[in-house]
Amino acid sequence: MTEARHQVNFITGNANKLSEVKAILEPAISVTNQSLDLVEIQGTLEEVTIDKCRRAAELVGGPVLVEDTCLCFDALQDLPGPYIKWFLGSIGHEGLNNMLLAYEDKGAKAVCTFGYSAGPGHEPILFQGITHGKIVPARGPSNFGWDPIFEYEGKTYAEMDKAEKNKISHRSRALAKLQEWFAKEMTA
């Protein structure tokens, strides 16, 4: 078994996100977890992630990894964007589809931004991954956010098994950049 060279404290209360992050990063990077109730500012995805990362590092008093995800509809100039969690909670999968009824363009992008901070006072470093797809009526299990309505190459995220999704998702693309950064830090 490969021993982890790095450890990150992933700040999330979302068990599905934690499971995906562990599946992608381990064993190369050991993932511990802490759930903190962090206030989220309004702003761009990058601003939200940087602020969340700084707050988490201060609360924990050490290194942290945070994540923010958005779903951007091409026809709506990237809305709902970083507010997807609130849109989904208010109007559900059907409501999100209804937002695009007047538009031919159902294109969307899933964007995941991780922020890593070495601790309080350290500037967060961002790692972003994007997957382009489209919005479709819900298909597959509905136990993980908007996965049933985001289609990539003929399958919704919800229709994919975990290994398949973890190869192509916005989250896996962002984490690949994090892994690359950690590898460079080891040789620096």
UniProtKB/Swiss-Prot annotation:
It is an enzyme of class 3 (hydrolase). Its main location: cytoplasm. It is found in: Cytoplasm; Nucleus. It holds the Pfam family Ham1p_like. Its EC number is 3.6.1.66. It catalyses: ITP + H2O = IMP + diphosphate + H(+); dITP + H2O = dIMP + diphosphate + H(+); XTP + H2O = XMP + diphosphate + H(+). One of its GO terms (cellular component) is nucleus. Keywords: Cytoplasm, Hydrolase, Magnesium, Manganese, Metal-binding, Nucleotide metabolism, Nucleotide-binding, Nucleus. ITP binds at residues 12-17, 52, 68-69, 85, 144-147, 165, 170-171. GO terms for biological process: deoxyribonucleoside triphosphate catabolic process; nucleotide metabolic process. Its cofactor is Mg(2+); Mn(2+). Binds 1 divalent metal cation per subunit; can use either Mg(2+) or Mn(2+). GO terms for molecular function: dITP diphosphatase activity; ITP diphosphatase activity; metal ion binding; nucleotide binding; XTP diphosphatase activity. Mg(2+) binds at E40. The keyword Hydrolase applies. Pyrophosphatase that hydrolyzes non-canonical purine nucleotides such as inosine triphosphate (ITP), deoxyinosine triphosphate (dITP) or xanthosine 5'-triphosphate (XTP) to their respective monophosphate derivatives. The enzyme does not distinguish between the deoxy- and ribose forms. Probably excludes non-canonical purines from RNA and DNA precursor pools, thus preventing their incorporation into RNA and DNA and avoiding chromosomal lesions. Homodimer. Belongs to the HAM1 NTPase family. This is Inosine triphosphate pyrophosphatase. It comes from Podospora anserina (strain S / ATCC MYA-4624 / DSM 980 / FGSC 10383) (Pleurage anserina). The lineage of its organism: Eukaryota, Fungi, Dikarya, Ascomycota, Pezizomycotina.
